[in-house]
A protein has these predicted regions:
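Surface-exposed helix-capping loop/turn segments at secondary-structure junctions
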Residues: 18-24, 105-109
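Low-complexity, flexible helical/coil segments
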Residues: 26, 61-64, 81-89, 116-124
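Alpha-helical scaffold elements lining the catalytic groove of polysaccharide deacetylases
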Residues: 1-22, 33-78, 91-97
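C-terminal domain-boundary segment and adjacent tail
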Residues: 90-131
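A generic alpha-helix propensity feature with a strong bias for hydrophobic helices
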Residues: 27, 32-33, 103, 127
Length: 131
């Protein structure tokens, strides 16, 4: 329900702010499950992903790395939002390999807010969905 979603978003925002001292400025719905009511209620830009590494499923650093590298090798990574989950240790291992590899191969890593400005030429808008 929308009430449950609002409670979950509020609790998450509070936890993030308590942990790092800054409130979230963007919102990624769990599992990508959202609708217009939730998007409006979140009062943040809604960020979806364009590359799913399936890291949550494989829990394998090399497979996660290979997934992103394959997209890059196919020329399908520029300007994309890569979904990875920080709760899995192998994802951290993949990230340690990916960041240097991406930089060595000419990629610039930016926040999703910066990406929206580059791709859309606008500041991220609350309630608007971005891929």
């Amino acid at each position: 329900s929308t009430d449950q979603a609002k409670e979950q978003i509020t609790k998450t925002n509070n936890a993030v702010e308590a942990a790092c001292g800054s409130a979230p400025t963007v919102f990624r719905p769990c599992y990508g499950a959202t609708n217009d009511s939730i998007n409006a209620m979140a009062q943040m830009p809604v960020i979806m992903w364009t590359v799913d590494t399936l890291d949550w499923k494989t829990k394998d650093a090399q497979k996660t790395f290979d997934c992103v590298k394959a997209k890059a090798d196919q020329g399908k990574l520029d300007g994309k939002i890569v979904l990875m989950h920080s709760i899995h240790e192998p994802t951290a291992g993949a990230t340690e390999k990916l960041i240097p590899w991406l930089k060595e191969n000419g990629y610039q890593l930016v926040t999703v807010s910066e990406l929206i400005k580059y791709k859309k030429g606008e500041d991220p808008q609350n309630g608007k969905v971005y891929y």
